[in-house]
Amino acid sequence: MALTLDACTLILKEHHLLKSVALNGDSNLNMTGIAYDSRKVTADTLFFCKGNFRPVFLTNAKEAGAVTYVAEQPIVEGNGMNALIVTNVQKAMAVLSAAFYDYPQDDLFIVAYTGTKGKTTASYFTQSILQDATNKKTALFSTIDRVLGPKPEDRFKSDLTTPESLDLFHDMRQAVENGMTHLVMEVSSQAYKKNRVYGLTFDVGFFLNISPDHVGPNEHPNFEDYLHCKLQLLVNSRHCVINAQTQNFGDVYAAATTTTEPENIYLFADTSYQPAQPVNIDFRFENQAMTLAESRFKVTAVSKKAIQLGVSGDYQLRLIGDFNESNATAAIIGAALGGADLIAAQQGIRRLQIPGRMETLAVEGHGQVYVDYAHNYASMKALLSFLQKEYNQPKLLVVVGSPGDKGVSRRAGFAQVLNEYADRAILTTDDPGYEDPATIAAEILAGIDQDKVDTTVEIDRATAIKQAIEESQPGDIVVLAAKGADAYQKVRGVDTPYPTDMVIAKQVAQQLS
């Protein structure tokens, strides 16, 4: 992979990003490396000065072999280097990274998901189906991990829901070189806020739902900005699939129609849903049977274009909850648009078990434990309301924490949902970052009505889990929320190893047996 200085200049001009160029040598200079982290610079590297940039980073990059830097203003430490001064370094990084890695998106059929809840689950379902349809040639970029190929060494833990653009195009190119033909990925609102997917057009873009989340000093200033960023996925997709039951449906559908013809927009909803405005629902789904281990549901194509996809039928799901049937229906539609047939869809849905999603453990002499990634008001409400209904109003004990440095609005959301459904809550640690976990817990606690919800704080997460399980009685439900299968706690910039909630729950169960 390589990129000349002339090519960089032309690309930046084409995207109206270039302010000025300062050359220090041959404009045909061939750059064989690309980086935004000075620790990853090698000889003849193109270096981006982005984010929380400090001039010493450019000094380090220059010493390591960087020959050109991209920034929004000239930097003294870059004297002696070529300088590309741009209006927006994040956008510049996206378009130059795509070119450096030779536009790998052109070699992939890309299905992308956005939504406040369900992105990860729907993405896993879609990849599972497409793995059958493509003979295991479907990559996955999710909140949990990145799957770039068929081998174990092609699987990596994710740091961000949507990677930085340079990493995104690198991983796409690696996936293509590993023989992948399809890619399923999550696209966060921050990906558009920070231009991580700038210039990308998706083959299929999904809008699952929207509710207030990710609003805070380090994320979105308000809900309107959050919604606007979410909508950009539809504006940049060739086919759009929308959950017709989403909040702000009118705004969502209008965004899709700005760049996509109606015949390439698909709507889905459960059979009981009657839209407030006259729209044609293309797919309906309906629960047929549910146990505490699985659910069976039916997907029916209603419109002519939906029938042509050929995926109407009965499905079996190893995840319970009507919200998971909705996610699975989305995946069936997305995979069908990517070439999957009914058999691949049924097999892919039936076999999948997603780590950290509705994992359950029965503890002898105590309650039933559920581990789930539900990490905001909307997903917690869906989870707790479902468990309350299925178990006929059990006592609900919830262990939960909220992350530091982001998603400040989640804290009030957790308090609200605990007030609505929980009998007992233990507030604990979940990726505190640079904040004090006790302060985060106190913010959640401030919104809880303790006359309704017996609430305590136990900062050590393992101890909190042990306490909740020990307290529980047969017939109770213990929910270990928001962390899923995450094997780390993010503390002051360091990923600190953590056994996972389920591992700790199993250890406690063994001690109690």
UniProtKB/Swiss-Prot annotation:
Location of N6-carboxylysine modifications: K230
Subcellular location: Cytoplasm
PTM statement from Swiss-Prot or TrEMBL: Carboxylation is probably crucial for Mg(2+) binding and, consequently, for the gamma-phosphate positioning of ATP.
Binding residues annotated for ATP, in chain numbering: G115, T116, K117, G118, K119, T120, T121
A GO term from the CC aspect: cytoplasm
Keywords per UniProt: ATP-binding, Cell cycle, Cell division, Cell shape, Cell wall biogenesis/degradation, Cytoplasm, Ligase, Nucleotide-binding, Peptidoglycan synthesis
Pfam families to which the protein is assigned, alphabetical: Mur_ligase_C, Mur_ligase_M
Similarity annotation: Belongs to the MurCDEF family. MurE subfamily.
Protein name, UniProt field: UDP-N-acetylmuramyl-tripeptide synthetase
Source organism per UniProt: Latilactobacillus sakei subsp. sakei (strain 23K)
Encoding gene (name): murE
